[in-house]
């Protein structure tokens, strides 16, 4: 439903430059520019990581930082379809496969303020490309906490502790989960989410972050 609405309102526009295009959601020029960005890939994670693999698509800088901020805070939801397409190209490049996609949830307060969960939008468009089902309400935010962006690396670890919970754990037991987040800084949020998924029987968790800004952590 989300895809149909956005496609109807914003047909044939590149989510990066805004130019009209005939196919895809990213024009050839922008695609070539984005190919120069270096992704961060960990196929064997650190001992303190609860996820099994990590793929971060773009550094949190330049045009991608600008587009993510526009998507999150300027209500430019159509950018999510380009982000979904770019994510699909990267997971295809590394042959990453999963049984389900699960977006990192946000609090009810943040949902009220913004009106949507940006990671859920990205996951829904990614699902259109990779044909993997999204479990939108399987992982939930169980309590409100402070904004991660205002905290130090050590404070972030404490801030997200026990902030997430799994509903319907039978759906993820023995399954490989692709966990979708918008921005990873220290990895505290995505690691805590992965911990909960593993706690309730997920076989493997592949963490995917669209942008990364390393400030110490995993």
Predicted feature locations:
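Glycine-rich phosphate/pyrophosphate-handling loop used in enzymes and phosphotransfer proteins
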Residues: 1-181, 185-218
